[in-house]
Amino acid sequence: MRGTAYYCTVEELQERGRDNIPEQFRSNTHLIYSSPATLAFNSPGAEGFGVKRAGLAIPDSIMLIVAPGCCGRNTSVLSSMRAYHDRFYYLLMDETDIVTGRHLKKIPKAVAEICEGLEKKPSVVMICITCVDALLGTDMERVCRKAEEAAGLSVKPCYMYALTREGRKPPMVHVRQSIYSLLEPKKKKGNVVNLLGFFSPLVDDCELYDLLHGAGVKTIHEISRCKDYEEYQTMSEANFNL
């Protein structure tokens, strides 16, 4: 098997049983190297879910992109999609902002202004910042707390840092933490599971659903199938995550 990629379907694993798991999947039999960068990999099947699109996985959320024009312009393609045309907002940075950091004081005001101008109050505002703020050493958590006070709703950071792609916490790892940090603690239910790690739903006839139901799981949550913020909050009832 050396030098050859190995894979196994869920059905094949089930047929083998727990006592006959392939050695390729048993970390105690050989070294399995997994770079932090692999956690940030987005497969073609994910339909292009980068930091910005993933940050809007929460139902009824909106995003404020704080960046120079050159960094934010590629979002215009996403903005043209029906599902996102009214969910992206921009706070452009100029040279003075970069030198003085004055744009940080504008963010809470911008968030409050956006929320006041919307007919429906968003569930959360995601603040997307770029490598510029990474180099400036911006404390975005503090800025988001100020924005929460100004707007009266949850505000979370979303780091579009290409610089950290190979680091301990790549952008896609951090955006997942931001998304699920909004779940409020609830009493756990033994027959509920969350499917995490991706932002598009599995196909309806995926064999994983039948396997989980056969194991006694009654409710399977996927963030992409949540219709509203209330349903998203029910994900905190899950007994375990897969």
Model-derived segments and their meaning:
Residues 1-242:
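An N-terminal assembly and electron-transfer interface module characteristic of large anaerobic redox
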